[in-house]
């Protein structure tokens, strides 16, 4: 996939808040995406990423999904954080969505070293957050990070594959689901299918790396055209889906 060409296409058609007639999406643009993040939270974010960028801890990766051909199986934490999308404006998007909509039961697929997990928690510290990570060493590092930030009571980390976790029978109904792992289009669609019984009409699904590969972009386009998702929003790197069966189907390509 030519990511530069994809970005040019996206930039030419992406909208801001003007010309949007959906009340929900207009509010998202006007009151959520444009809302300033407090200096306290910004300071917290900066301290986290400064610490991680200087962490030479080596993690041996077990690849359970479609790992990038350009990334080694053994990487330092400071190498991992340079490719982590939740350290920039997309991390701010996670924070703002959590802060604005106050989801109380949250599921994250793909803890990695815990950056996205912390952004989700900081957005709504009252939420009960479950985060799944299949790689044992990555899970152990993220666990230490949660302990250092003293949020182990609000964040439950589980060392499991996504499929094994979804086999459990007594799962909560989740208000927000963030999927950042595996990077296989077919599997992404299968996970969302399995999550149907564990989510509700207003559950917000956030999908990371929708342009990771042609396969992932094809999966995203399939989901956009799926009649059960009545709202879909393309933020270029991330995509957002909500079922909202009481609303007419709409798709938006928004500038972040």
Question: Over which residues does each language-model region extend?
Answer:
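A short alpha-helical cap/connector motif
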Residues: 1-176, 183-204, 210-256
